[in-house]
Swiss-Prot record:
Protein name: Chaperonin GroEL
Keywords: ATP-binding, Chaperone, Cytoplasm, Isomerase, Nucleotide-binding
Any one GO molecular function term: isomerase activity
Pfam annotation, one family: Cpn60_TCP1
Reactions catalysed: ATP + H2O + a folded polypeptide = ADP + phosphate + an unfolded polypeptide
Function: Together with its co-chaperonin GroES, plays an essential role in assisting protein folding. The GroEL-GroES system forms a nano-cage that allows encapsulation of the non-native substrate proteins and provides a physical environment optimized to promote and accelerate protein folding.
EC number(s) given by UniProt: 5.6.1.7
HAMAP family documented for this protein: CH60
Signal peptide positions on this chain: none
GO biological process, one term: protein refolding
Sites where the protein binds ATP: 30-33, 51, 87-91, 415, 479-481, 495
Length: 543
């Protein structure tokens, strides 16, 4: 076991803060309408240019192990916020940095770290309650468009596309983002279905960058049982191999031996194949397999109907124009099923929804209905260069997540104003002792940081703007895009409540943990021994 170095108290916390500052300073330049780009070096190909906070955070690894620990912990804030809300990563990082900087000063001054943490936790809970009070529902197309525009760094075209996509497939519908062929952004709505089961092995992935499997015009085999023996699949595999097309297998499960054989055949290029588990459980699984069968024109191979897998042939397979499989879900686009059969199935599901007695059954039936009838909206991002394409695709992804979050939990005034307005909820909040009160005051001050950073990135004087905004009430705030003050909601500057709430909760949680850190342990870096000198060349032979 390698020797370890241990740092204690102020020395440990100072190192940790250095790492946090390095990461946060790189991330926070992207915040707001006048945020700047960050260029990320890649091992292969051109550098990536981005304004996406979490993309910047993910790239940062520091040489000093103690500083790197601090950076990695704050990276977790950005990643967790992105996972939960899909946006707000930069806001979360800025909040965590502000809290930690002031919190460590308080610890150095002799305050009790645990009481500071308890004060921060109390204040965070109160602020979350206040954000819910300030939140307004986001249901109309105009609000959805405004949220999308702000999250895409004030790109109104993106906001319009997302609002249009949601209008076409419904707020629960599936919307995907792809790279387009031309310079213009496009919206395509295609019949499709998505379910929450991913590939059974990562070796099926065809796109190594985002670990997805893309199958063009594949055959689709539906099996209502476990596949344990590869021999059962041979007739189908041989037929598909001769056709030169790909095969998607949807089964209850594929056991290890059969799965290993499929993976090997796939990697050798014998037959392009991907296996996924069937969605749902029990009777619901059978019903969902039947839905997929109707959508794709397949026949479910079911022993209940007296069918055996080894008797299956090409006639039992369905087709679709495209299938995309990730580690978490599968999307079948433009299935080749009979249109009349699909309409009949949709009508049958509508009747079942009307007859359902339990809320749970009703909800599950409505999900199936949306998947069969809603289709999939595809936003194709256009750009002049590949670097611009990647940057824009990241922004559209962010905006899409933000609009979904807005529909889910509502919206608040953007531009850091909601957090400033929530400050008043902390006025009457008192902790159990002075150190807890200081923790409450820390968070009260730290939540001004996002607005201060937006102003700084726009080249303004942050203290002047913060005091001006605090002097007024309601949605009054600062529009950094054109250096004006006014009603943020009327100006269309909105943030999803879920994004602001998640950023605040994750930042407070991580900052509390880091403030209460007393020791850090890391391996001692050993310098690699110098290479020995090469031997000298021999003398040429003499006559």
């Amino acid at each position: 076991m390698a020797a370890k170095q241990v740092l204690f108290s102020d020395e440990a916390r100072a190192k940790m803060l250095d790492g946090v500052n390095t990461l946060a300073n790189a991330v926070k330049v992207t915040l707001g309408p006048k945020g700047r780009n960050v260029v990320l070096d890649k091992a292969y190909g051109a550098p990536t240019i981005t304004k996406d906070g979490v993309s910047v955070a993910k790239e940062i690894e520091l040489e000093d192990k103690f500083e790197n620990m601090g950076a990695q912990i704050v990276k977790e804030v950005a990643s967790k916020t992105a996972d939960v809300a899909g946006d707000g990563t930069t806001t979360a990082t800025v909040l965590a940095q502000a809290l930690l900087t002031e919190g460590l000063k308080a610890v150095a001054a002799g305050m009790n770290p645990m009481d500071l943490k308890r004060g921060i936790d109390k204040a965070a809970a109160k602020l979350v309650e206040e954000l819910k009070v300030l939140s307004k529902p986001c249901s109309d197309t105009k609000s959805i468009e405004q949220v999308g525009t702000i999250s895409a760094n004030s790109d109104s075209t993106v906001g319009k596309l997302i609002a249009e996509a949601m209008a076409k497939v419904g707020k629960e519908g599936v919307i995907t983002v792809e790279e387009g062929k031309g310079f213009e952004d496009e919206l395509d709505v295609v019949e499709g279905m998505q379910f929450d089961r991913g590939y059974l092995s990562p070796y099926f992935a065809t796109n190594q960058e985002n670990m997805t499997t893309d199958l063009e015009s594949p055959y689709i085999l539906l099996v209502d049982k476990k596949i344990s023996n590869i021999r059962e699949l041979l007739p189908v595999l041989e037929g598909v191999s001769k056709s030169g097309k790909a095969l998607l297998i949807i089964a209850e499960d594929v056991e290890s031996e059969a799965l290993a054989t499929l993976v090997v055949n796939n990697m050798r290029g014998v037959v392009k194949v991907c296996a996924v588990k069937a969605p749902g459980f029990g009777d619901r699984r059978k019903a969902m397999l039947e839905d997929i069968a109707i959508l794709t024109g397949a026949t479910v191979i079911s022993e209940d109907l007296g069918m055996k897998l080894e008797e299956a042939n090409m006639e039992h397979l369905g087709t679709a124009s495209r299938v995309q499989v990730s580690k978490d879900d599968t999307t079948i686009i433009d299935g080749a099923g009979n249109k009349d059969a699909i309409v009949n199935r949709v009508n049958q599901l509508k009747a079942n929804v009307a007859e359902a007695t339990s809320d749970y059954d009703k909800e599950k039936l409505q999900e199936r209905l949306a998947k069969l009838s809603g289709g999939v909206a595809v936003i194709r991002v256009g750009a002049v260069t590949e670097a611009e394409m990647k940057e824009k695709k990241d922004r559209v992804d962010d905006a899409l997540h933000a609009t979904r979050a807005a529909v889910e939990e509502g919206i608040v005034a953007g531009g850091g104003v909601a957090l400033i307005r929530a400050q008043k909820a902390l006025d009457g909040l008192v902790g159990d002792n002075d150190d807890q009160n200081h923790g409450i005051a820390l968070l009260k001050k730290a939540i001004e940081a996002p607005l201060r950073q937006i102003v700084s990135n726009a080249g303004g004087e942050s203290s002047v703007v913060v005091n001006e905004v605090k002097a007024k009430e309601g949605n009054y705030g600062y529009n950094a895009a054109n250096d004006t003050y006014g009603d943020m909601v009327e100006m269309g500057i909105l943030d999803p409540t879920k994004v602001t709430r998640s950023a605040l909760q994750h930042a407070a949680s991580i900052a509390g943990l880091m403030i209460t850190t007393e020791a850090m342990v890391a391996e001692i870096k050993e310098d690699a021994p110098a290479m020995p000198m090469g031997g000298m060349g021999g003398m040429p032979g003499m006559m």
